[in-house]
């Protein structure tokens, strides 16, 4: 087996025993990138020189010598951070995001920045301002989004792990499509300092990895209070690896009836239910539960997220950094032309929608109502988690669709139906592979937990991973 096929914890063990050197590990991944990147297109920037230079001053931490990929909306000092948008082309931040700083402090090495839907707006990575990323399991299919580059890089062996961001499913959905593990932590568990904002009350950074153990390892490093982020929660640090036990005996698992009653792909439903049966065999108690307000989650999300985006994206004007239009005979026309030329269609669509729902006369009818619905959804989850340890659903209603197939924006928005409620409520959730459809495309299962219930979802995910033996499955490129 090649080094690029190994997990983070397997590489770490080899490095600690000095059976391989950090140089050999790094070379293995760049060699793999050279072999398959033209097909996958997971990266927008590769940082070979920076990575090799960092070997000379490598810190002896928990990730010493481990190369990682970073989504292109997470700030990296002196390295292009474009959000896959023309408007931020050539922008190099003067600082590292807190998560990047923490990875470096533990000896992590940045391989490069991964492709994404522009400003994290999309579910296919087709909205990238550069090029679409391809699913390593079938290159004609989408890897999901918006963290499609991160998920594809991990699945293709172009990185042992990656960071993504999740606003409405952007870590979990591509993880499901690419057959890897994607963890969206509790809102406030991981610092957002240095994350380019899409919807500030929904965004959260998390890991995408080959197995559940690696997700726990990366969460150990990136989680924790950060005074630079006012939404970061100051609580005692946990060691998430202590939850990696193959044991769900007596655990109460809820299946939300509002999810399972929806009309979605039968192969996805069958594989998820068969995985749930494995947990029952392992001693878990599985019961149906109700989240009555969940049906309004998608509508509320597509009001709140664009509203926050229209405010956050107002800062891109061509004056201080990024793209500036050469057309225009006044400051006002320069602003207008810069934004018209610099933003892609999906970003413009969401800015316009957000501006509309925040405008006078419509604020109460849309934005205020959506926030009230958000409270009801949070209360639904809080009520259910009084009696249940975790909830389980499919991660996505379908497996990966073909690139160019999903042309209707509303249809694309519907694909977030299982993931969005988690962000609305601010709770943690993980997507783990649970099988394949008849076309050999991966299927993901989502495990949701209460606020700061990462331990419970990791324990459930780990047990499932052991039962299904999915972590050894890799695409052939």
From Swiss-Prot:
Question: What EC number(s) has UniProt assigned to this enzyme?
Answer: 6.3.5.7
Looking up SUPFAM superfamilies in the UniProt record yields: Amidase signature (AS) enzymes (SSF75304)
Which region is the signal sequence? none
Supply one GO CC term from the record.
glutamyl-tRNA(Gln) amidotransferase complex
Entry keyword set: ATP-binding, Ligase, Nucleotide-binding, Protein biosynthesis
Q: What Gene Ontology terms describe what this protein does at the molecular function level?
A: ATP binding; glutaminyl-tRNA synthase (glutamine-hydrolyzing) activity
Organism superkingdom: Bacteria
- The reply to whether Ligase figures as a keyword in the UniProt entry is yes
The processes (GO biological process) annotated in the record are: translation
Known catalytic reactions: L-glutamyl-tRNA(Gln) + L-glutamine + ATP + H2O = L-glutaminyl-tRNA(Gln) + L-glutamate + ADP + phosphate + H(+)
UniProt xrefs under InterPro entries:
Amidase, Amidase_CS, Amidase_dom, AS_sf, GatA
Q: How does it assemble?
A: Heterotrimer of A, B and C subunits.
Q: Which family does it belong to?
A: Belongs to the amidase family. GatA subfamily.
Q: What does this protein do?
A: Allows the formation of correctly charged Gln-tRNA(Gln) through the transamidation of misacylated Glu-tRNA(Gln) in organisms which lack glutaminyl-tRNA synthetase. The reaction takes place in the presence of glutamine and ATP through an activated gamma-phospho-Glu-tRNA(Gln).
Name of the protein described by the UniProt record: Glutamyl-tRNA(Gln) amidotransferase subunit A
Q: Which organism is it from?
A: Halothermothrix orenii (strain H 168 / OCM 544 / DSM 9562)
Q: Which gene encodes it?
A: gatA
